[in-house]
């Protein structure tokens, strides 16, 4: 199945957890308005506005009183005009930014966690070369959204970010100026650019971790094997 994995765009290689380095990386928080059906806004803050076309949901902590009334409701993304739900997940940080975040596929590992746990759609827009895909996503149906996406097709994430931020300023969907921040970001140990999370075809083996019947069957098959030394059978 298609699944996310860490990717270094410079070395053009997948990166294992053992090869990761977490480093401080400068960026900017952009306060962006999504809109309800009555056009009232709800604001999120993001360091990666170029991923707006890949947004699949807004996520807040289930105990956050500010957003409890909105769980299950739909909002529309700015510029690209795609409807997404507001959902609850315990990994959301109430004291970070606006306390509600957009989940995009994929900006970071938290996006991957939300995508898996909440069974969200896959809307990947970054290629292995680190550039925006050249094909128009089928979930963008609004003419204005299509026109803007055509402007970022094939661009680097840095160039796409500038185009999207300029468009947000022009549309009035960005509240104030971007605020500088520093965050911990994953790098390949040999690389000098932050890792991207791209999707690729991957194969999985069922090991019985979530299936008790399969687990019992595999244990019985394991008893048919000879282990040397025998105590390694239960390791």
Language model features by range: what are they?
Residues 1-129, 134-135, 139, 221-235:
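NTP-handling and nucleic-acid-processing catalytic cores
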Residues 4-14, 180-191:
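A glycine-rich phosphate-binding loop feature that marks nucleotide/adenosyl-phosphate handling sites
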Residues 69-72, 139-161:
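A glycine-biased structural micro-motif
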Residues 116, 169, 189:
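Anion (oxyanion) recognition and catalysis
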Residues 130, 164, 188:
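Active-site cavity-forming subdomains of large catalytic enzyme subunits
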Residues 155-182:
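Phosphate/diphosphate-binding loops
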Residues 183-227:
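Glycine-rich loop/linker segments at domain edges
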